[in-house]
């Protein structure tokens, strides 16, 4: 677990191109694109400054993490998707300093104690939570699933409400 590094705002562009291929993440998500990367691989980023500090996001590939983000990687005994859901559920913002500019430090985050189940259970839990996450946050899969659920609900109530034969008997 470590903090990202400073990069000048003048080095960040809004649109990805051949000379700025790497996403640049700050404490609250994607800031833009840069020429260089300082991290590589699947990671979790935790926002460390501002009112939204403590938010957690999954990133992968080559990217640049600014000083406003804490970068953490999984270990063999920890499923990164499980860790994402656990950290998100923990509401890390509650551990932020109570100042004009709330903040989290790597030191404070690394002292938090959590219980981690066996890796097989982590995979199972992460798989279930990932499915729910997709259904609730991804319009391409969530919306059709919601429409299908409402269609079934409609058919159920339609069949119940329009079954006059049962009422006459």
Locate the predicted segments by residue.
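Charged, alpha-helix-forming regions
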Residues: 1-169
